[in-house]
Structures are given as C-alpha cells and as structure tokens.
A protein has these predicted regions:
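Histidine-centered metal-chelating micro-motifs
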Residues: 47-49, 67, 83, 87-93
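Ligand-binding loop in jelly-roll beta-barrel domains
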Residues: 87-112
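Short acidic-glycine-tyrosine-enriched beta hairpin
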Residues: 73-87
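Conserved short histidine dyad/triad with adjacent acidic residue
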Residues: 38-53
C-alpha cells in the first residue's frame, strides 16, 4: 500500500498549457496496473487547450470555479462537481475564478502522457 499527501508529489508544468500544472499522484511509478490519478491546478484565467484523445477522463472538482467544454456545450464547475469525458470527445477546462481551479483526473494507464 502507498499512502501519502498529494503535495508530497512534485508539481510539474503541463507541456501544452500555460498556467496549468499537475501531479501524478498514483501511476506507473507506484506500480498501478490500470489507472493513473492526477491532480491538476489551473491558474485564474488559464485553460487547457481544446483537444481529443483515445481515452476517457473521470474528473472530481476539489476547489475553485471554472467551466468545462465538451460534447458541444459548456458547464459551470465548482467544488463537488464530477465530469465524465468520453474518449475522442473534444474538451477543455478553464478557470473562471480568482483562485486555483484544482481537480482530480483519472485516466487509464494506457493514456498516460
């Protein structure tokens, strides 16, 4: 078993989005065979690029306010919201608040970037 605080994992800048950083809190290094758990921080005014990929996402909003684009619509986000993004669906997360938008994102191990 591995138990630790998420801040014990190094915060890394996202490669294709300014103002977006993440921690891979559970993944290949921990010998997780199926899934990767990541914690994202999106700075105020920042967003991920609109993009698609072959794997799904499961997201849980921890703090902050924002919106998610997906399936041709936008939805406002706040703590406690959950989001399912199917594979190959264009999507984007944007921070619309004045504090960090923080969320947990689960993906299959095969989707780890």
């Amino acid at each position: 078993m591995i138990a630790r605080h998420y801040t014990d994992v190094k915060l890394e800048e996202a490669t294709e989005a300014e103002g977006v950083s993440l921690r891979v809190v559970i993944g290949e290094k921990e010998q997780a065979p199926n899934f990767v758990m990541r914690v994202f921080d999106v700075e105020p005014g920042a967003s991920s690029p609109r993009h698609t990929h072959d794997w799904e996402h499961e997201v849980f909003i921890l703090s902050g306010e924002g919106r998610v684009f997906g399936g041709g619509k936008e939805v406002a986000l706040s703590p406690g919201y959950t989001v399912f993004v199917p594979s190959m669906e264009e999507h984007q997360f944007t921070n619309t608040g004045d504090e960090v938008l923080r969320f947990v994102c689960l993906i299959p191990l095969s989707g780890q970037c």
